[in-house]
Amino acid sequence: MAQVAMSTLPVEDEESSESRMVVTFLMSALESMCKELAKSKAEVACIAVYETDVFVVGTERGRAFVNTRKDFQKDFVKYCVEEEEKAAEMHKMKSTTQANRMSVDAVEIETLRKTVEDYFCFCYGKALGKSTVVPVPYEKMLRDQSAVVVQGLPEGVAFKHPENYDLATLKWILENKAGISFIIKRPFLEPKKHVGGRVMVTDADRSILSPGGSCGPIKVKTEPTEDSGISLEMAAVTVKEESEDPDYYQYNIQAGPSETDDVDEKQPLSKPLQGSHHSSEGNEGTEMEVPAEDSTQHVPSETSEDPEVEVTIEDDDYSPPSKRPKANELPQPPVPEPANAGKRKVREFNFEKWNARITDLRKQVEELFERKYAQAIKAKGPVTIPYPLFQSHVEDLYVEGLPEGIPFRRPSTYGIPRLERILLAKERIRFVIKKHELLNSTREDLQLDKPASGVKEEWYARITKLRKMVDQLFCKKFAEALGSTEAKAVPYQKFEAHPNDLYVEGLPENIPFRSPSWYGIPRLEKIIQVGNRIKFVIKRPELLTHSTTEVTQPRTNTPVKEDWNVRITKLRKQVEEIFNLKFAQALGLTEAVKVPYPVFESNPEFLYVEGLPEGIPFRSPTWFGIPRLERIVRGSNKIKFVVKKPELVISYLPPGMASKINTKALQSPKRPRSPGSNSKVPEIEVTVEGPNNNNPQTSAVRTPTQTNGSNVPFKPRGREFSFEAWNAKITDLKQKVENLFNEKCGEALGLKQAVKVPFALFESFPEDFYVEGLPEGVPFRRPSTFGIPRLEKILRNKAKIKFIIKKPEMFETAIKESTSSKSPPRKINSSPNVNTTASGVEDLNIIQVTIPDDDNERLSKVEKARQLREQVNDLFSRKFGEAIGMGFPVKVPYRKITINPGCVVVDGMPPGVSFKAPSYLEISSMRRILDSAEFIKFTVIRPFPGLVINNQLVDQSESEGPVIQESAEPSQLEVPATEEIKETDGSSQIKQEPDPTW
């Protein structure tokens, strides 16, 4: 522990014990870091002062040095006291010079008041069930305070018009705006009396019953804007006497000045994100950010390369359907259009006006940034700002003077409020460049950094063509070096591993030899220009003997490639045979014995497996995908089963085998207590979720009701998994979700009866047919492809689900075609089973067509999607393995790459497709990724804890924890049938579905 000395600092207020514990804990963590630095032969000395305590932390030599120099400690304490006094004096000086800054503060306070007012209007609109801002009737709310309740205001702040708040209160409200919500309890009293002398005419009456049944139909009027004479409009209001759901009125709006940390620190990963598109990162309540490429996985990151489209909240009605916020709309029943609907449109913003405004502001900010950047590098004329470099080198390249809460990014990612605030602070903005060499070394690659959105497709087509040309050139030159006239695939890894024996001559200056996917357009063009000079030099041809086949296999996307299903089935069977043989050897038997996997999971202290590849837990082979199965097969020689208590597994062996086991012989050797302790290769211990290691219920383990336990996880508390109960539950949920989808589809067509959803049409035309209101992280697919958690999420969110059908004629044609093509078999099926099916759906009045091969067709599509996910995961694993210097595929830590932006960069992805786990990709996106497989490349910019590079763990102290978390990533938890999940109720345990925030 750090050494603590007592100083003579004056103490006015004693710190609470909790704060002191926090400081002590952090100091111990600092000391642990110093120990790790000492292992690298680095010396550290640190002095920390907290109230009356002086902490001396560092390595052994560092602490010894500081302890011998007491004058250092005294000087540091004295310096801290003086700085506190200076800070107090500065505070006084600021208060005295407040009058001199009134002009600056007037602009700032006006902006903050407008922001708070807009945010109050936004919250009030949500309470009324509208997706647009609604003016807040402040006078009525203050006069009748029990009608509308405002929750979440900071302690000590009363609700009133923002004009009555001072600067500090406005900032305080914006910092705590995440919890602010309006709750409408009842209509305002005396609705016919209005302040201001105007006589208002109301719209057509509309009402809605409370979902909780707490009160009857009510009418709530909204205040008009001050500058318009539009009549008041009635809004459908959902009234709740008490908030039954704490998240009902919460809309996940981030607060605080920090842009990169708030999302991860303040938003729990396990909580479903409602209205995540309204996440505001700074102190602006009126703007929201919508990802430009994909909305299925929303992890905001300021260092992300992909720009976000940020619009103000009033512009929701102008956003395209794919980028319109879907999870924030409260349910509203269809109501007749009011008579004055035409007048109401006057209150909405004009898109052309908004577009012209934001385009002009972005252009001004872009010119401002370029001018300031040119001043920093002392350049004349137009310059291009390397935005990715500023994001990846935040310590050496950054911008000062930006308004609080606004990060430095491309102007195209800002909304109108932030652009205006940046222009107000333009005099204070300054570019700081500490290392000019960072700009010079990559200047030629940065010419591609600023493509206009309109030319992105053209750029992608161009770079794809150039990379293919360079790849063909390299293959041709490589074949010439081998004395062949037919082009051969180049083993780039071998050339990187043996630079002295395998290298290339004639490349342009400062361009190393790598795979074409590493090059940008300028370098590719230079290589093509000197193509005649390029020559492959092979001094040791024997190094290439085993590489050609290895390299050509992943590069071929032809029908010669082995079928995925055959491949994974073969690998699983092979691993199953390895496990059975190793288990028999551990029991002293010569014949292979089937492994009772549930017994191993429930007794990890007495039954475990050593020698498994790093990061792979022991499970049934049916749980693994192709990358893990291949790693297990490669490392099969190291695998060893340890059976400390043979009596636990005897009841699961065939009758003839149990008598051959010598229990004493198995128990006599002294085996290590922990798996992997005697392994020569450092293994990371991975604990399988669920088992209770303290009280293993061995009595339940011995029960003879053991089926094919390879697929069924064993309950740690001794209760067995009931397949019948699980199957009944998931079948019922799937039927309910399917009925829900059919009902919503009928509503979208204006019908009172349900209509069977043509899922193929929704998959083929996602722009014309899509679904809004699904839970965060749940894509629209057939209910048969979901597991229990997602099915339950969909049913909980059923009120918000809405089908959007833009082309009803195409929809009706598809329904007619499917009905006409599948109706003849229906006449043949006149068995009692058909009658049962019809009676089961009679109450719902569903238009249903009985299809004999519907299940086969559905399963084939599910299997096809699984194959695509497996192939994409295999591709990512192989590319990631290449990036970290491994010669084999390595599981991609998707979650770590997401929460550590800038550490790993993925290049070569198709336009409009962002990098994420395959389970979150659409089928069309996965196909495009496989088509661009040659150009996808992982680049490790800076390692994160737990990353293995060239067989060396980056941070041994942190490796164990992350690996345990990574074992549950969606890309590696393969489920044989669908995305089945782990359900934790009293009697069953099913594999868990990946968290949507991963």
Curated annotation (Swiss-Prot):
Gene3D superfamilies: GTF2I-like. InterPro entries: GTF2I (IPR004212), GTF2I-like_rpt_sf (IPR036647), TF_II-I (IPR016659). Signal peptide: none annotated. The keyword Phosphoprotein applies. Residues 303-318 have a biased composition (Acidic residues). Changing residue 248 to F: Abolishes BTK-mediated transcriptional activation. Abolishes BTK-mediated phosphorylation and impairs BTK-mediated transcriptional activation. A motif (Nuclear localization signal) lies at residues 320-327. The modification Phosphoserine is found at residues 19, 103, 207, 210, 214, 412, 517, 668, 674, 722, 784, 823. Residues 241-342, 662-681, 687-714, 816-836, 958-998 are annotated as: Disordered. GO terms for cellular component: cytoplasm; membrane; nucleoplasm; nucleus. The modification N6-acetyllysine is found at residues 130, 353, 450, 715. The modification N-acetylalanine is found at residue 2. The keyword Acetylation applies. The modification Phosphothreonine is found at residues 556, 558. One of its GO terms (biological process) is transcription by RNA polymerase II. Transiently phosphorylated on tyrosine residues by BTK in response to B-cell receptor stimulation. Phosphorylation on Tyr-248 and Tyr-398, and perhaps, on Tyr-503 contributes to BTK-mediated transcriptional activation. Sumoylated. Keywords: Acetylation, Cytoplasm, DNA-binding, Isopeptide bond, Nucleus, Phosphoprotein, Repeat, Transcription, Transcription regulation, Ubl conjugation, Williams-Beuren syndrome. It holds the Pfam family GTF2I. There is a cross-link at residues 221, 991 (Glycyl lysine isopeptide (Lys-Gly) (interchain with G-Cter in SUMO1)). Interacts with the basal transcription machinery by coordinating the formation of a multiprotein complex at the C-FOS promoter, and linking specific signal responsive activator complexes. Promotes the formation of stable high-order complexes of SRF and PHOX1 and interacts cooperatively with PHOX1 to promote serum-inducible transcription of a reporter gene deriven by the C-FOS serum response element (SRE). Acts as a coregulator for USF1 by binding independently two promoter elements, a pyrimidine-rich initiator (Inr) and an upstream E-box. Homodimer (Potential). Interacts with SRF and PHOX1. Binds a pyrimidine-rich initiator (Inr) and a recognition site (E-box) for upstream stimulatory factor 1 (USF1). Associates with the PH domain of Bruton's tyrosine kinase (BTK). May be a component of a BHC histone deacetylase complex that contains HDAC1, HDAC2, HMG20B/BRAF35, KDM1A, RCOR1/CoREST, PHF21A/BHC80, ZMYM2, ZNF217, ZMYM3, GSE1 and GTF2I. Interacts with BTK and ARID3A. Interacts with isoform beta of PRKG1. Interacts with GPR50 (C-TERMINAL DOMAIN). This is General transcription factor II-I. It comes from Homo sapiens.
